[in-house]
Amino acid sequence: MDFKRKAYDQLIQWKNKKNHKPIIVKGLRQVGKSYIVSKFAKENYEHVVIFDFRHQPILRKCFSSGYDVDQIISYSKVYLSDSVFVPYKTAIIFEEINDCEEARTSLKAFALDGRYDVLATGSLLGVNRYGREKKTAIPTGYEEYLEMSSLDFEEFLWAMNTPLDAIENIKKSLTTLQEITPSYHEYFKEMIIRYIAIGGMPDAISAFINPNLPIFRYA
């Protein structure tokens, strides 16, 4: 389901910032990183090119001859035949960049080049898997980061179609320590109980909202 996420607005701020650098959206798996990055790119750029290193490992070959941006693009057209690269109008997504160390290193080249906005997702960045030392040349100073987690309580309320004015009223009451109405108290108490029971993972919330999904329903 298409949930409203705060990370989307943060990506808008990143895009509108002058001289922004490639951004890496980090976080646990299944929290919605890939979905929100793809949605943002498709809604804000004329063209989007996705390098999915997890499901298309052959794309790692695009970086086999170095980190020249034009050369990387030239190689990528061999494996992504429908890709369109237009300077300042194309967003490049590196999906699961932790699966391609060379792509991580190339971010410096893309940052210095400046013609393409690069967004990357990663679930295990900085983690030494199976005792193997990670030797990725991290381009210090040429990356920006966005930490993404499961839906927080406010995002959960959005997913439950809670009226925005009700959310603002309860936030104001909490800030000013003003008493809330009994109806508000009962409603938000119920929402808190649901949030504790369901959690903030997008798939779990989708299962609760959509009773037609072929999995058990929450009480």
Residues covered by each model-derived region:
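N-terminal pre-Walker A segment at the start of P-loop NTPase domains
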Residues: M1-K17
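Hydrophobic positions on the alpha1 helix immediately C-terminal to the Walker A/P-loop
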Residues: I36, F40
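Structural recognition of the conserved hydrophobic beta-strand(s) that form the central parallel beta-sheet
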Residues: I93, D117-S123, E147, F156
